[in-house]
Amino acid sequence: MNALTAVHNNAVDSGQDYSGFTLIPSAQSPRLLELTFTEQTTKQFLEQVAEWPVQALEYKSFLRFRVGKILDDLCANQLQPLLLKTLLNRAEGALLINAVGIDDVAQADEMVKLATAVAHLIGRSNFDAMSGQYYARFVVKNVDNSDSYLRQPHRVMELHNDGTYVEEITDYVLMMKIDEQNMQGGNSLLLHLDDWEHLDHYFRHPLARRPMRFAAPPSKNVSKDVFHPVFDVDQQGRPVMRYIDQFVQPKDFEEGVWLSELSGAIETSKGILSVPVPVGKFLLINNLFWLHGRDRFTPHPDLRRELMRQRGYFAYATHHYQTHQ
């Protein structure tokens, strides 16, 4: 199995009942599914993982898989195959996940445990140099002086893939809402590559496969530049991307103009989804054929949003990019 193996027989269409959770198509797109853990599942999970504080998950990486197994067992071992099937399915590849009863910032540690369990049923989350852990928590406020658009509230954070400036493969991205106060706007933005009307034009351009330099600002704590093309293909020849407009460094006029046009074509796509993510919920997407970003917020002096992210590789994948390793 590879990271983009075609998977048929859509689980939502089959009418199958699941133990411990429900699964429905989202209001925004049939590609994005909503998975909700029942109140009983949530309660039992939190009780069974209560002996391990988040610090234990940070220090002992095998515990991240242990809590994943606990969650899967509570779901009659139906959860892990469903997660993998959805994320590896090119026609879907995205989930909005919620646990009934987890919806307040006071439960932040419980949120980290739940997200960790889910992520480690599909693979392993990479070391995040920005935080020094396998996950990162960060806050968006009304005023920001950071060196990237990650925390800037009053502008759109453009659509991009994660992991463009590191050497580790980034198959999945998990983005969780921990807290939100005095907030209007700021929906998550998603674009599936196959819904991008300009994909064929840019994928077939001569510069699409040229290795380009990606360099991160100081806040990312990554000092080494990496080189890779914007586009690649999976084993079936379908396009995948590793792109972010902030960190790609064109070497000449030709690359700069092409990248600028590429950015404009992505940001004006009619296929972009706007997805509200309430506190306690998280998005889990296939990073190779979904781009993600964030809409702007309405200014407020006490605006606050806290997020948690994890990004990593599918443990069940053997090949990620067909031509560029």
Swiss-Prot record:
InterPro entries listed in its UniProt record: GlaH (IPR015038), TauD-like_sf (IPR042098)
Catalyses which reaction(s): glutarate + 2-oxoglutarate + O2 = (S)-2-hydroxyglutarate + succinate + CO2
Pathway stated in the Swiss-Prot or TrEMBL entry: Amino-acid degradation
Stored Gene3D superfamilies: Clavaminate synthase-like (3.60.130.10)
EC code: 1.14.11.64
Cofactors demanded by this protein: Fe(2+)
Keywords assigned: Dioxygenase, Iron, Metal-binding, Oxidoreductase
Biological process per Gene Ontology, one example term: L-lysine catabolic process
Signal peptide segment: none
MF terms (GO), sorted A to Z: ferrous iron binding; glutarate dioxygenase activity; oxidoreductase activity, acting on paired donors, with incorporation or reduction of molecular oxygen, with 2-oxoglutarate as one donor, and the other dehydrogenated
Highest taxon of source: Bacteria
UniProt: Fe cation binding residues: H160, D162, H292
Subunit structure: Homotetramer.
Role: Acts as an alpha-ketoglutarate-dependent dioxygenase catalyzing hydroxylation of glutarate (GA) to L-2-hydroxyglutarate (L2HG). Functions in a L-lysine degradation pathway that proceeds via cadaverine, glutarate and L-2-hydroxyglutarate.
Name of the protein in its database record: Glutarate 2-hydroxylase
Natural source organism: Escherichia coli O139:H28 (strain E24377A / ETEC)
